[in-house]
């Protein structure tokens, strides 16, 4: 019996283990996504509650700007939302990659199984053929071993036939052996392919592990972001202290503004000097234009003279035609014509040169004017921008002074015992005026710069204008209420009514102050 060839190992077990590992990895990713699907960290709700606290709970010793804290915390919330969106996109990419890899693996396994089946069937068929050939050879050997009776030589003997059959069978065996070797090599190639696929699956599993590690790192980053949010809350408190320092710096900026105003005055003087220079240049241009006109008139006179000379030449030619009999006169005529042509050429060249020179001078003057105009426009634009900046800074400083003076007046009035309805009425009117000014500033903040300057001018007190009764008057000592002529110091209302009106005025003034601080921060 012929020895059977060794078959490659069956890849069913390895495929099952690979599919099980892929399913486990998918389950882990789904569980991770379900855990992280809400997308809101635990500390966010707590921080929103902290930010939602009313601004009226501030102490009397200092004021807190809720706009700053809200902007800082919500800014970090947006950053956390962006990280969660990145995680979602990465998870979707991983899911797509897993689906594509699983589909590719399933296709490869199906192809491998089909190839293994076909190879097994072919091997069985070839083994069956080899067995048949072996049996036939065994029979032939037995027949050749038995003694045969001599027969008459009627044709080819049986021994020769058997030898031919054996030779034919040997050739078939050799061909079958070659086919078996080729199949063995194919099986080896298939085994190599299976090994490579297993290595790829292992690499994919390693990638999945790396992605899980990245997800864990992202979780740690989210925790770090929460810690950063807490640090930002502490920074907000520090910013409040910095705002106080900025108020001191504003005083220094006022001095700088005065210096800038002096510089602007100098710039205006320079602009006036430039205007005078431009006027002088315009006068020069007018003079140059007059010169050009005079030169054109001269050229016209020269052209008229040339025409007269041509007429004279024509007359001379006629005379020469009459005197054609004389040979010497013909030579003279030719020489005269040559001289006249030379004079004409020289005059034309001189005219062309003068025209080109005049055109070059005009172009140079025009370019100089254009460059000077551009310089003047740039200078004017820069001066206008500086003036607008100075106006905005002055407007902001006046508003800050108003707020500071209002705070000082409120603290002084809360410290002193009050009795009377007149002071409360003045406080309410002052707070209403401040709220109106803040609203006007909010409206004019998104408008154009000229409108902003008009609103700032409207906010300023106009000298000589009538002041409403019960309004606040700004003086050296601070804000003082104007006396109401109708009440004349009479105490109206009880202590409870006065206390309620005072609290309402404080709340309204704090709201106006918070709005103003938000505007300055923006």
Curated annotation (Swiss-Prot):
Biased composition (Basic and acidic residues): 439-452
Sequence segments annotated as region (Disordered): 1-77, 439-503
Naturally occurring in which organism (per UniProt): Homo sapiens
Biased composition (Polar residues): 51-62
Superkingdom, natural source: Eukaryota
Biased composition (Pro residues): 1-11
Coiled coil: 157-328
Biased composition (Low complexity): 456-471, 489-503
Keyword NAD among UniProt keywords: no
Keywords, ordered alphabetically: Coiled coil
Family membership noted in the UniProt record: Belongs to the GOLGA6 family.
Protein name, as recorded: Golgin subfamily A member 6-like protein 10
Keyword presence, Repeat: no
